[in-house]
Amino acid sequence: MERRKTLEYVTNQKQVERQILELVKTYNVLYKKQIYAFFAVDGKEKFVGKALHALLKERLIYMNEITKTVSQHEEAYQFREKGTLKAFWVLLSLMEQKKIERHFLAEKEEYPVRIVFVGDAEIYDILYISEAEIQLVNQLFSRQNPDGCGHIVIVEKPEEIPQIEIPNVIGFCTVQEEEGGIDYYRREERKRRNTKAKRTIGCRAENSRTCRSYACGSP
């Protein structure tokens, strides 16, 4: 019995190592907190510490103790992308609420999309739009044919939401990049031009990423 438990532990440990390596290769740079949160969804966070240590020892990853980030190599941090880090927090939030079958980093050509994921055989994406990019993004989407993909849009401030004019948005949110706190919002039906964003989740807790609600219903 004891041997079986040991073998099971080692198997889980190796599996977590492989998954961490895959995550880092996919998203380039992640906060260590994000990696722990990713495995906490399946109750495997207890394997993360030793897995990171093993990967560091083999020089398969690099960990910056100042920024608390994990990447493939030391130079990678300077190429970190704020929108992707925020989008990964949103992905983690959704993973706590529903089954995410697949997820991957969007191509540069898919700007402003950062992460694409599949849930219940439906495709969704997570966008990051800074205040300076709103007009450009509106123009880009005005030239595209709607693809039916549901969009979750990250903004810097909720006051920016009424300015965003893209189809198939199922929810808006603001995200704290390093801590992962998330506030979700939805936009009321456009009966007037001065549509306001309606806050749907009161997430001011220390870890608001774990709130069990979604702005416009689960995607």
What are these regions, as identified by a protein language model?
Residues 4-5, 22, 35-37, 102, ...:
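Hydrophobic transmembrane signal anchors and adjacent membrane-proximal interface regions, especially
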